[in-house]
Amino acid sequence: MGQKVHPTGIRLGIVKEHTSVWYADGATYADYLLKDLKTREYLQDKLKSASVSRIDIHRPAQTARITIHTARPGIVIGKKGEDVEKLRQDLTKQMGVPVHINIEEIRKPELDAMLVAQSVAQQLERRVMFRRAMKRAVQNAMRIGAKGIKIQVSGRLGGAEIARTEWYREGRVPLHTLRADIDYNTYEAHTTYGVIGVKVWIFKGEVIGGRQEELKPQAPAPRKKAAK
């Protein structure tokens, strides 16, 4: 039976970059790794309502630089920067080194796999029909300019007794093409019937010579004239 490799892991160093960048010897490697994991868990918990997609951690010369990619930067920053300063102080205590926080806004959340998965999961928790939630997310992504998108949900869909998997796809999603920029992420919806897993693949174009194809919104199909 064929198994699928992680779409991001296989592309690291080709079209994807690591979310943690630092050098460590054998004695400190495990310590750095655990601190990174706890830092991400802490930020995801603190910023649940801020639509956080990705957290990058860099450790240059006894400091830490954390970049938070979010669709709602105002919630992260807070009034007059109070919230982000409190985050910085807490993370400095937790990591044991001076921390600098950068915030990057996600301009097109419809093309971010994590944010799309979060949106579908939240709709499932509000008892929206799973097919409607998937179709709406797919149509929004294709309208903004995605080359292809696939969404898969697994679990007791609609409260069914037996769990099953359903998926919906539009456009191309070439998982075997290493130069293809595919954004992949997962999220969980906690419903009254149990946990429903959501997976999202978004194909944004091929990276050729270090340059990505420009994403353009798809033009609407020309209308056919009715026969008289």
UniProtKB/Swiss-Prot annotation:
Any Pfam family from its record, for instance, is KH_2
Recorded GO MF terms: mRNA binding; rRNA binding; structural constituent of ribosome
Matching entries from CDD domains are given as: KH-II_30S_S3 (cd02412)
Q: Does the keyword Ribonucleoprotein apply?
A: yes
Instruction: List keywords of the entry alphabetically.
Output: Ribonucleoprotein, Ribosomal protein, RNA-binding, rRNA-binding
Q: Name one GO cellular component term.
A: cytosolic small ribosomal subunit
According to its UniProt entry, one GO biological process term is: translation
Specify the KH type-2 domain's residue ranges.
Answer: 39-107
| SMART domains for the chain | KH (SM00322)
Q: So where does this one cross the membrane?
A: none
Its subunit composition reads: Part of the 30S ribosomal subunit. Forms a tight complex with proteins S10 and S14.
- Into which family does the record put it? Belongs to the universal ribosomal protein uS3 family.
Write out the function statement from the record: Binds the lower part of the 30S subunit head. Binds mRNA in the 70S ribosome, positioning it for translation.
Supply the NCBIfam families for this chain: rpsC_bact
What is the name listed in the Swiss-Prot or TrEMBL entry for this protein? Small ribosomal subunit protein uS3
Query: Which organism does this record belong to?
Result: Pseudomonas putida (strain ATCC 47054 / DSM 6125 / CFBP 8728 / NCIMB 11950 / KT2440)
